[in-house]
Structure formats: structure tokens, C-alpha cells
Amino acid sequence: MSFAMTDPATTMSWVQVIVLSIVQGLTEFLPVSSSGHLRIVSQLFWGEDAGASFTAVIQLGTELAVLVFFAKDIWRILTAWFAGLADKSKRNFDYRMGWMVIAGTIPVGLAGVLLKDLIRENFRNLWITATVLILFSLVFILAERRGKKTRGFEELTMKDAVVMGLWQCLALIPGVSRSGGTISGGLFLNLDREVATRFSFLLAIPAVLASGLFSLPDAFDPQAGQAASGLQLLVGSGIGFVVGYISIAWLLKFVSNHSFAWFAAYRIPLGLLVMALLGLA
């Protein structure tokens, strides 16, 4: 196990793919930063970064878990959105929700394109990951304390969607957490904890799917991180799907009566541990 930096131009082993896919599935939907965990586990056990492209592609498996878990909600929103486009009299809340997801996706889409090189190179520094794990935990605690948690799902507005979309941009930095960023934003907007969590999942779908498909060619490029075969990416995505589905069900049950501050209690010691290991290395 090593935190030393090595030449990334290597191919991934099956053990790496399986372990990292399980880590991805476990952490993608929890506010602990899946990209941060993948970065830490890769460096700790194999001494090298699996790469942002590999991470983005296996996220497709966990996003498929979201599509399956929320299939009824997604279908209802999509049908209402298309019906509303054709007939103004059918523009109900689900129609507006379709536009809210689109509006909330635009900020992270623009940030991802404009900051692509910065994200894949500078932001993947382990010192940054460890520091952000600690600092953003304080944001969780503040959001829990300041948020009134009184607003329901049908009280969501376009402004809420854009604000949570801006919070989602922070997730481009390993250590923040996509769900942690958007849910914190929702809590600051006084949304109920479960409402913020559910909208966070819906908001992530287009952004993560686009990121994964866009990064697919780079996942086979050793210069973009460790190279993985097509079969490895397929198996990794499958593992991420199964583990991710279980994680979604657990998180929704957990947030109904538990504070997000519990995740801060995990993130802070983890960040300190990584810093200690980096210092020793």
C-alpha cells in the first residue's frame, strides 16, 4: 500500500476493477464523495490514480441504478414534459419539474466543459481531496443547523433548481460529493431532507450520464489514467449498478430520521487519516 505517485500509464487488474466498482456503488449516492474515495483507494492500494475517465464511465452503472429505482417518477416527469410542450393546459408540476432538472443541469454542464483539464489534473491532488473532505463536512453541519426543512416536493421552484445546480458544480472537486453538495444546497433552501435528497438524485442523472458517455473514449487511454478494457468497464458498471441500487434504498430510509451530520463524523477522520498517510509518505 502506497501513497507515492507512480507512472499512470498502466492497465488495470480485475481486482482493481471489482474493488473500485464496489467503492463506487457504495459511495456514489452517499454524501462522502465517490470520486474522493476512488482516488484514495486507488492510491492507497495500487499507488496510482485510476483516472477521472474510468471514474466517469463506471458511474454509468450507478446512474442506471437511479433510472431503475426512480423509473416511475422519471417516466411521469418525461411524459408530463412532452405533454406540456404540446398542450399548455397540461403544464402541471411534473412538467415544471422537467424544466427544473434541465435548468439545474446547465451550470455543471458548462463547468464540466470549461474546467475539464483543471478537473482531471489539478483537482485530483490527494491533499486537495483530504482538505475538502474535512472542510465540506462543516458545510453539512451548518446546512443541517440553518435549514428549516419545512418545504415539500411540490414547493420546489426554478430558483431552487438553479441554486442546487450551482451547488452541484462543487462536486467536480473530489472530496465534495455530488449528493452532499446538492443536498446541502437544498437544506439551505429550507427543503425537507428527503425532498432535497430525491431532487438531488434526479438532478444528477443528465449530468452524470453525459459525463460518462463523454469520457468513454478516454477510459481506454493510458494517458488519461489507468487503461481499462471494454469488458472491465462493463463488469465494473454492472457491479456499481447492483451496489448503487442498494445504497439508494438505504440512504432514502436513513435521511427520513437521521441528520447528515453523521456523514461529517465519518468524513473528517477520513480526511485527517489521508493527510497523515500523505505526511508519512
Swiss-Prot record:
BP terms from Gene Ontology: cell wall organization; peptidoglycan biosynthetic process; regulation of cell shape; response to antibiotic
Entry EC number(s): 3.6.1.27
Known catalytic reactions: di-trans,octa-cis-undecaprenyl diphosphate + H2O = di-trans,octa-cis-undecaprenyl phosphate + phosphate + H(+)
Keyword terms of this UniProt record: Antibiotic resistance, Cell membrane, Cell shape, Cell wall biogenesis/degradation, Hydrolase, Membrane, Peptidoglycan synthesis, Plasmid, Transmembrane, Transmembrane helix
Superkingdom of origin organism: Bacteria
Regions crossing the membrane: 12-32, 50-70, 99-119, 123-143, 156-176, 199-219, 231-251, 260-280
Localization per Swiss-Prot or TrEMBL: Cell membrane
Keyword Cell wall biogenesis/degradation on entry: yes
Membrane association type: Multi-pass membrane protein
Record InterPro entries: UppP
Family the UniProt entry places it in: Belongs to the UppP family.
Role played: Catalyzes the dephosphorylation of undecaprenyl diphosphate (UPP). Confers resistance to bacitracin.
HAMAP family: Undec_diphosphatase
The name this protein goes by in its record: Undecaprenyl-diphosphatase
Organism field: Corynebacterium striatum
